[in-house]
Protein backbone atom coordinates (compact mmCIF):
# COMPACT_ATOMS: atom_id res chain seq x y z
CA UNK A 1 0.00 0.00 0.00
CA UNK A 2 1.40 3.38 -0.87
CA UNK A 3 1.31 6.52 -2.93
CA UNK A 4 3.98 7.73 -5.31
CA UNK A 5 7.46 7.51 -3.76
CA UNK A 6 6.32 6.07 -0.41
CA UNK A 7 4.88 2.88 1.01
CA UNK A 8 2.69 2.78 4.10
CA UNK A 9 4.14 1.25 7.28
CA UNK A 10 1.99 2.38 10.20
CA UNK A 11 -0.10 5.20 11.61
CA UNK A 12 -1.12 6.51 15.01
CA UNK A 13 -4.24 8.51 14.20
CA UNK A 14 -3.75 12.24 14.61
CA UNK A 15 -0.20 11.83 15.91
CA UNK A 16 2.25 10.03 13.66
CA UNK A 17 2.64 8.17 10.36
CA UNK A 18 5.55 6.02 9.18
CA UNK A 19 6.29 5.65 5.48
CA UNK A 20 8.86 3.55 3.68
CA UNK A 21 10.82 4.08 0.48
CA UNK A 22 9.19 2.63 -2.68
CA UNK A 23 11.95 0.91 -4.65
CA UNK A 24 10.00 0.93 -7.94
CA UNK A 25 9.00 4.60 -7.91
CA UNK A 26 9.15 5.84 -11.53
CA UNK A 27 11.37 8.83 -10.67
CA UNK A 28 13.84 6.67 -8.78
CA UNK A 29 14.02 5.14 -5.32
CA UNK A 30 13.82 7.82 -2.60
CA UNK A 31 17.05 8.14 -0.67
CA UNK A 32 15.63 7.32 2.74
CA UNK A 33 14.74 4.12 4.51
CA UNK A 34 11.91 5.43 6.64
CA UNK A 35 10.06 8.74 6.74
CA UNK A 36 8.26 9.58 9.98
CA UNK A 37 5.63 12.33 9.86
CA UNK A 38 4.62 13.77 13.23
CA UNK A 39 1.97 16.25 14.29
CA UNK A 40 3.47 18.92 16.55
CA UNK A 41 2.42 22.33 17.73
CA UNK A 42 3.49 25.17 15.44
CA UNK A 43 5.15 26.81 18.43
CA UNK A 44 7.43 23.76 18.88
CA UNK A 45 8.80 23.35 15.36
CA UNK A 46 12.04 25.29 15.75
CA UNK A 47 12.83 23.91 19.19
CA UNK A 48 12.11 20.36 17.99
CA UNK A 49 14.64 20.68 15.15
CA UNK A 50 17.15 22.34 17.49
CA UNK A 51 16.76 19.47 19.97
CA UNK A 52 17.26 16.83 17.28
CA UNK A 53 13.71 15.53 17.68
CA UNK A 54 12.94 16.11 14.00
CA UNK A 55 14.85 17.03 10.86
CA UNK A 56 12.47 19.44 9.12
CA UNK A 57 8.85 20.55 9.07
CA UNK A 58 6.37 21.11 6.28
CA UNK A 59 4.94 24.51 7.16
CA UNK A 60 7.27 27.39 6.26
CA UNK A 61 8.50 29.15 9.39
CA UNK A 62 7.35 32.64 10.15
CA UNK A 63 9.82 35.49 9.83
CA UNK A 64 10.21 35.55 13.61
CA UNK A 65 10.86 31.81 13.73
CA UNK A 66 13.42 32.02 10.93
CA UNK A 67 15.28 34.81 12.72
CA UNK A 68 15.16 32.88 15.98
CA UNK A 69 16.55 29.81 14.24
CA UNK A 70 19.40 31.87 12.79
CA UNK A 71 20.20 33.17 16.26
CA UNK A 72 20.42 29.56 17.44
CA UNK A 73 22.94 28.82 14.69
CA UNK A 74 20.56 26.52 12.85
CA UNK A 75 20.51 25.69 9.15
CA UNK A 76 18.15 28.32 7.66
CA UNK A 77 17.67 28.65 3.90
CA UNK A 78 15.83 31.37 2.01
CA UNK A 79 14.16 30.65 -1.32
CA UNK A 80 15.92 32.20 -4.31
CA UNK A 81 12.56 33.09 -5.85
CA UNK A 82 9.12 33.81 -4.38
CA UNK A 83 7.31 30.62 -3.41
CA UNK A 84 4.06 31.89 -1.89
CA UNK A 85 1.25 34.27 -2.78
CA UNK A 86 -1.37 36.24 -0.86
CA UNK A 87 -4.60 37.01 -2.68
CA UNK A 88 -7.38 39.55 -2.12
CA UNK A 89 -10.50 37.73 -3.28
CA UNK A 90 -13.38 39.66 -4.88
CA UNK A 91 -16.83 38.19 -5.54
CA UNK A 92 -17.27 39.17 -9.19
CA UNK A 93 -21.04 38.68 -9.05
CA UNK A 94 -21.35 41.20 -6.23
CA UNK A 95 -18.71 43.51 -7.73
CA UNK A 96 -19.35 43.05 -11.48
CA UNK A 97 -17.71 46.24 -12.80
CA UNK A 98 -14.02 45.66 -13.47
CA UNK A 99 -13.33 49.35 -12.85
CA UNK A 100 -14.32 48.89 -9.21
CA UNK A 101 -12.01 45.91 -8.93
CA UNK A 102 -9.21 47.86 -10.63
CA UNK A 103 -9.77 50.70 -8.16
CA UNK A 104 -9.29 48.28 -5.28
CA UNK A 105 -5.96 47.16 -6.72
CA UNK A 106 -4.74 50.75 -7.02
CA UNK A 107 -5.99 51.69 -3.54
CA UNK A 108 -4.46 48.84 -1.53
CA UNK A 109 -1.01 49.60 -0.12
CA UNK A 110 0.74 46.36 -1.03
CA UNK A 111 4.14 47.62 0.07
CA UNK A 112 2.83 48.35 3.57
CA UNK A 113 1.33 44.87 3.76
CA UNK A 114 4.69 43.40 2.72
CA UNK A 115 6.53 45.38 5.37
CA UNK A 116 4.08 44.52 8.14
CA UNK A 117 3.57 40.86 7.31
CA UNK A 118 6.77 39.77 5.55
CA UNK A 119 9.35 42.25 6.86
CA UNK A 120 10.06 43.18 3.28
CA UNK A 121 10.63 39.61 2.08
CA UNK A 122 8.08 39.75 -0.73
CA UNK A 123 7.38 41.60 -3.95
CA UNK A 124 4.21 43.49 -4.88
CA UNK A 125 2.62 41.75 -7.84
CA UNK A 126 0.45 42.74 -10.78
CA UNK A 127 -0.84 39.25 -11.61
CA UNK A 128 -0.44 35.64 -10.48
CA UNK A 129 2.69 35.32 -12.66
CA UNK A 130 5.68 35.50 -10.29
CA UNK A 131 7.60 38.77 -10.86
CA UNK A 132 10.97 38.08 -12.46
CA UNK A 133 10.06 34.53 -13.51
CA UNK A 134 10.46 33.25 -17.06
CA UNK A 135 6.85 34.04 -17.98
CA UNK A 136 6.70 37.48 -16.38
CA UNK A 137 5.79 40.14 -18.94
CA UNK A 138 6.92 42.93 -16.64
CA UNK A 139 3.59 44.59 -15.85
CA UNK A 140 4.37 46.94 -12.99
CA UNK A 141 1.91 47.78 -10.23
CA UNK A 142 2.09 50.95 -8.16
CA UNK A 143 -0.34 52.40 -5.65
CA UNK A 144 -2.39 55.30 -7.00
CA UNK A 145 -5.28 56.42 -4.79
CA UNK A 146 -6.21 59.26 -7.16
CA UNK A 147 -6.54 56.81 -10.03
CA UNK A 148 -8.66 54.57 -7.80
CA UNK A 149 -10.97 57.49 -7.05
CA UNK A 150 -11.21 58.36 -10.75
CA UNK A 151 -12.14 54.78 -11.65
CA UNK A 152 -14.83 54.73 -8.96
CA UNK A 153 -16.27 58.00 -10.26
CA UNK A 154 -16.20 56.72 -13.85
CA UNK A 155 -18.00 53.54 -12.80
CA UNK A 156 -20.62 55.47 -10.83
CA UNK A 157 -19.76 53.69 -7.60
CA UNK A 158 -22.88 53.65 -5.43
CA UNK A 159 -21.05 53.81 -2.10
CA UNK A 160 -22.58 50.67 -0.66
CA UNK A 161 -20.77 48.82 2.13
CA UNK A 162 -18.97 45.65 1.08
CA UNK A 163 -18.59 42.71 3.42
CA UNK A 164 -15.12 41.25 3.90
CA UNK A 165 -14.35 38.03 5.74
CA UNK A 166 -10.97 36.85 7.02
CA UNK A 167 -9.48 34.33 9.41
CA UNK A 168 -7.91 35.48 12.67
CA UNK A 169 -4.44 35.23 11.10
CA UNK A 170 -5.37 37.90 8.52
CA UNK A 171 -7.02 40.44 10.82
CA UNK A 172 -4.11 42.90 10.74
CA UNK A 173 -4.03 42.75 6.94
CA UNK A 174 -7.77 43.35 6.80
CA UNK A 175 -7.41 46.46 8.96
CA UNK A 176 -4.85 47.94 6.55
CA UNK A 177 -6.96 47.12 3.51
CA UNK A 178 -10.08 48.52 5.16
CA UNK A 179 -8.32 51.86 5.68
CA UNK A 180 -6.75 51.81 2.20
CA UNK A 181 -10.11 51.29 0.51
CA UNK A 182 -11.70 53.96 2.70
CA UNK A 183 -9.04 56.38 1.45
CA UNK A 184 -10.35 55.81 -2.07
CA UNK A 185 -14.03 55.91 -1.12
CA UNK A 186 -14.93 52.24 -0.60
CA UNK A 187 -16.41 51.26 2.76
CA UNK A 188 -16.06 47.69 3.97
CA UNK A 189 -16.91 45.90 7.17
CA UNK A 190 -14.74 43.02 8.34
CA UNK A 191 -15.82 39.77 9.97
CA UNK A 192 -13.50 37.11 11.40
CA UNK A 193 -14.52 33.50 10.76
CA UNK A 194 -13.03 30.03 10.35
CA UNK A 195 -11.31 29.27 7.03
CA UNK A 196 -14.00 26.87 5.78
CA UNK A 197 -16.71 29.44 6.53
CA UNK A 198 -14.81 32.08 4.58
CA UNK A 199 -14.43 29.94 1.47
CA UNK A 200 -18.01 28.63 1.48
CA UNK A 201 -19.37 32.14 2.07
CA UNK A 202 -17.38 33.51 -0.86
CA UNK A 203 -18.56 30.69 -3.09
CA UNK A 204 -22.25 31.15 -2.26
CA UNK A 205 -22.18 34.96 -2.39
CA UNK A 206 -22.59 35.63 1.33
CA UNK A 207 -19.40 37.69 1.39
CA UNK A 208 -17.94 40.14 -1.10
CA UNK A 209 -14.25 40.07 -0.20
CA UNK A 210 -11.68 37.83 1.46
CA UNK A 211 -7.97 37.05 1.80
CA UNK A 212 -6.23 33.73 1.22
CA UNK A 213 -2.71 32.46 0.71
CA UNK A 214 -1.12 29.61 -1.22
CA UNK A 215 2.11 28.19 -2.52
CA UNK A 216 3.07 29.79 -5.84
CA UNK A 217 4.54 28.26 -8.97
CA UNK A 218 6.43 29.42 -12.04
CA UNK A 219 4.03 27.34 -14.15
CA UNK A 220 1.75 30.08 -15.56
CA UNK A 221 -1.54 28.21 -15.14
CA UNK A 222 -1.09 27.14 -11.54
CA UNK A 223 -3.97 29.45 -10.48
CA UNK A 224 -6.22 28.49 -13.41
CA UNK A 225 -8.90 27.09 -11.12
CA UNK A 226 -9.41 30.48 -9.50
CA UNK A 227 -10.38 32.01 -12.86
CA UNK A 228 -12.39 29.19 -14.44
CA UNK A 229 -16.12 29.90 -14.73
CA UNK A 230 -16.72 26.13 -14.81
CA UNK A 231 -15.61 25.87 -11.18
CA UNK A 232 -17.40 27.09 -8.06
CA UNK A 233 -14.67 29.68 -7.65
CA UNK A 234 -14.12 31.87 -4.61
CA UNK A 235 -14.55 34.88 -6.91
CA UNK A 236 -17.79 33.74 -8.60
CA UNK A 237 -16.42 34.34 -12.10
CA UNK A 238 -18.94 33.78 -14.91
CA UNK A 239 -17.03 35.24 -17.89
CA UNK A 240 -15.59 32.35 -19.96
CA UNK A 241 -12.79 34.22 -21.74
CA UNK A 242 -10.12 33.65 -19.09
CA UNK A 243 -10.82 29.91 -18.99
CA UNK A 244 -10.82 29.73 -22.79
CA UNK A 245 -7.42 31.42 -22.98
CA UNK A 246 -6.11 29.12 -20.24
CA UNK A 247 -7.20 26.10 -22.29
CA UNK A 248 -5.39 27.52 -25.34
CA UNK A 249 -2.21 28.07 -23.32
CA UNK A 250 -2.34 24.54 -21.92
CA UNK A 251 -2.71 23.05 -25.40
CA UNK A 252 0.12 25.07 -27.00
CA UNK A 253 3.38 23.11 -27.26
CA UNK A 254 5.52 25.71 -29.05
CA UNK A 255 7.44 27.61 -26.31
CA UNK A 256 7.50 30.93 -28.17
CA UNK A 257 3.79 30.82 -28.97
CA UNK A 258 3.01 29.78 -25.40
CA UNK A 259 4.98 32.78 -24.12
CA UNK A 260 2.95 35.10 -26.38
CA UNK A 261 -0.28 33.60 -25.09
CA UNK A 262 0.86 33.98 -21.48
CA UNK A 263 1.64 37.65 -22.19
CA UNK A 264 -1.92 38.05 -23.46
CA UNK A 265 -3.13 36.22 -20.35
CA UNK A 266 -1.35 38.67 -18.06
CA UNK A 267 -2.85 41.64 -19.90
CA UNK A 268 -6.30 40.12 -19.54
CA UNK A 269 -5.83 39.37 -15.84
CA UNK A 270 -4.60 42.89 -15.13
CA UNK A 271 -7.47 44.44 -17.07
CA UNK A 272 -10.28 42.27 -15.73
CA UNK A 273 -8.80 42.20 -12.20
CA UNK A 274 -11.06 39.31 -11.07
CA UNK A 275 -8.98 39.24 -7.89
CA UNK A 276 -6.02 41.24 -6.58
CA UNK A 277 -2.65 39.57 -6.12
CA UNK A 278 -1.26 41.39 -3.08
CA UNK A 279 2.26 39.98 -3.13
CA UNK A 280 4.48 37.01 -3.81
CA UNK A 281 6.55 36.10 -0.77
CA UNK A 282 9.93 34.52 -0.19
CA UNK A 283 9.89 31.60 2.22
CA UNK A 284 12.39 30.07 4.60
CA UNK A 285 13.27 26.51 5.49
CA UNK A 286 14.79 25.23 8.71
CA UNK A 287 16.29 21.74 8.76
CA UNK A 288 18.81 19.66 10.65
CA UNK A 289 22.38 19.37 9.43
CA UNK A 290 22.02 15.64 8.83
CA UNK A 291 19.20 16.09 6.32
CA UNK A 292 20.79 16.30 2.86
CA UNK A 293 19.34 16.39 -0.66
CA UNK A 294 16.12 18.00 0.54
CA UNK A 295 14.76 21.09 -1.21
CA UNK A 296 12.04 22.58 0.94
CA UNK A 297 10.98 24.95 -1.82
CA UNK A 298 9.92 22.33 -4.37
CA UNK A 299 6.87 21.09 -2.51
CA UNK A 300 4.43 23.32 -4.36
CA UNK A 301 0.99 22.83 -5.82
CA UNK A 302 2.14 20.61 -8.70
CA UNK A 303 5.21 18.58 -9.59
CA UNK A 304 6.47 21.15 -12.09
CA UNK A 305 10.14 20.24 -11.62
CA UNK A 306 9.44 16.78 -13.02
CA UNK A 307 7.21 18.11 -15.80
CA UNK A 308 9.99 20.36 -17.04
Give names to the regions the model predicted:
Residues 1-30, 34, 44, 145-146:
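Gly/Pro-rich hinge or "lid" segments in bacterial periplasmic/extracellular proteins
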Residues 96-179, 183-184, 264:
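Append "and occasionally in soluble cytosolic enzymes with long acidic Gly/Pro-rich linkers
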Residues 43-55, 67-71, 99, 175-184, ...:
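Short helices/loops that flank or line small-molecule/ion binding pockets
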Residues 20-25, 74, 78-103, 107, ...:
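A bilobed periplasmic-binding-protein/Venus flytrap-type ligand-binding module shared by bacterial periplasmic
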Residues 22-67, 187:
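Ligand-site clamp/hinge motif
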Residues 285-308:
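Long beta-strand-rich cores associated with HINT superfamily self-processing modules
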Residues 189-198, 223-289:
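Extracytoplasmic/peripheral linker and loop segments enriched in polar/acidic and small residues
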Residues 153-216, 283:
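Ligand/substrate-recognition segments at binding pockets and active sites
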Amino acid sequence: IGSGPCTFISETAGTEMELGSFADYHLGTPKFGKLVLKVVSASNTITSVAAGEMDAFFQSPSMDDALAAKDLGMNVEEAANPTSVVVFLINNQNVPDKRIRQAMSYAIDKELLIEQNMRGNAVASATCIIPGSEYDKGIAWSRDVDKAKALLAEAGWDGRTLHMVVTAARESMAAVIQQNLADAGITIDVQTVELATMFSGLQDGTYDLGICGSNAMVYPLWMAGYYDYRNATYCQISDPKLAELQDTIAAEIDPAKKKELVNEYQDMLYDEMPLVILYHGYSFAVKSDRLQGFNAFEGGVNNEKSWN
